[in-house]
Every structure is written in C-alpha cells, then in structure tokens.
Amino acid sequence: MKRYNAKRKTHRNLKSIKKLIPTVLALLAFVSLLAGIITLHNPKTLPFRQIKITVSSDHIKMAELKDIVVHHIQGGFFSFNASALQTALMSLPWVHDVSVRRIWPNELEIQVEEQRPIARWNQNELITQEGEIFSPPIETIPQNIPQLSGPNDSEENVLNRFQQFSQLLIPFHAAVTALSLTKRGAWSLILNGHTQIFLGRENIDQRFEQFVHLYPKIIGANINRVEHVDLRYSNGLAIQWKN
C-alpha cells in the first residue's frame, strides 16, 4: 500500500512539473527577449565606425553639420535617434531636405540638400521654385537674383506670374528682374534691370500678351533706351523713352 501511494505521489509530482514547463519556457523566452532589447538599446552595441556626410552647397558649412552630427550620435546602430538628428539638421536655414540612412553593421550615411532659391521675396527672405519661403542670414542672400514682392500670403500668386512672364519673354532674351504686386492688386515688373512695365490691376493676361506681341515691333533692340512702358490704358500703351 505504501509503495502504491508513493507511486501516485511521484506521478502527481511529474504532472505538476509538466504543467510548469510551458510557464518556465515562456518566462525564459521573456527574459531572453528583455535581455536582447536591453543589449540593442545599449549605446555600446554596434557603435558607428564610419559616418559619411554628403552636401553640395555654397551656403551650408560642413563644420556646422559635423557639430550637429557629433552632438546627436549618442547611440549605436539600433539605439541611435535618426529622427532627432534629421530635425536638428533641418533647422539650418539653407537646408531643404535631409536623408539619414543606417548601413549594416556600423555605418551612417547623411545626405543634405540645399535650398535652391529662384528669387528674393520682399526684404530679407528667399523663395524657391516650389514656393517655399525661408529666411537665411542677410549676408548669405544672393544679390544677382530677381526681386519679388507682394502682400502677405501672395507669394504663390506672385511666383506663378513671375514664371508665366519669364516664359513668355524667353524668345526675346529678356529677363524679369523684379515683379511687384501692391496691396491694391496692381502689378508692375522690371525687365533687364532697368525697364519698368506697368500692368495695373485689370486684364493682366491680356495686357501682357499685348506687350509681348508689340515687343519685337516697337521695343526689340531698343529696350535699353526705354524708361518704362505703361499698359494701363484701355486702348494701346504709352512708352517713355530715356533722354
């Protein structure tokens, strides 16, 4: 009888142990996973051995980029905060876009794209072909680009007009060097840095097309002798010649 009871007790113990096995295995798996996560987030795990910064720029200093990168390299391949570095680099006024890429097992590749302004906007800002306005240090603003100006929130309209007028003038080798929109909605532009064109507030497309049509016939090679052209008349235009 005692032997029978001992067998039953042993059998119960084995069943209890078997029931615990899945729990123990799950616990071991969790501990292993936790240890792996801790290891991956350890800054000493797979630290970067090579950092490559690529930038084609006249206004972004490599030394400034390196300072920001060094400040944000606080982790290894897995723990490194790429988003924080990208945000920091994007805060530089001349930076248009930033790409941060990790290359296994210990390389970091950073590509920085510079803003490409096509004109100056109002006083101390620049505008890109996509209509993005940014404010770089005044001393870095190029002096040989067109000047666009207009009221707040008019930059898209002014930029579209600038591109439209510039395209129409290509056959005549004339360039729009300034374009202005007043608060009252009046348009004027300057060609080749010296000849002013007044378009007024109404029928802008019609008036400019009239100017383009008459340009080779009346102005053409004499553009340097023209002070201004006034297209604000319902029938015709007025030309002021230089003395």
Swiss-Prot record:
Ranges where the POTRA domain occurs: 46-115
GO CC term, one of those recorded: cell division site
Gene Ontology BP, a term: FtsZ-dependent cytokinesis
Cytoplasmic side: 1-19
Main location, first listed in the record: membrane
Annotated compartments: Cell inner membrane
Membrane topology (UniProt): Single-pass type II membrane protein
Keywords, ordered alphabetically: Cell cycle, Cell division, Cell inner membrane, Cell membrane, Membrane, Transmembrane, Transmembrane helix
Regions of this protein lying in the Periplasmic compartment: 41-243
Sequence intervals crossing the membrane: 20-40
Subunit structure: Part of a complex composed of FtsB, FtsL and FtsQ.
HAMAP family: FtsQ_subfam
Its job: Essential cell division protein. May link together the upstream cell division proteins, which are predominantly cytoplasmic, with the downstream cell division proteins, which are predominantly periplasmic. May control correct divisome assembly.
Descriptive protein name: Cell division protein FtsQ
Organism of origin: Coxiella burnetii (strain RSA 493 / Nine Mile phase I)
Organism taxonomic ancestry: Bacteria, Pseudomonadati, Pseudomonadota, Gammaproteobacteria, Legionellales
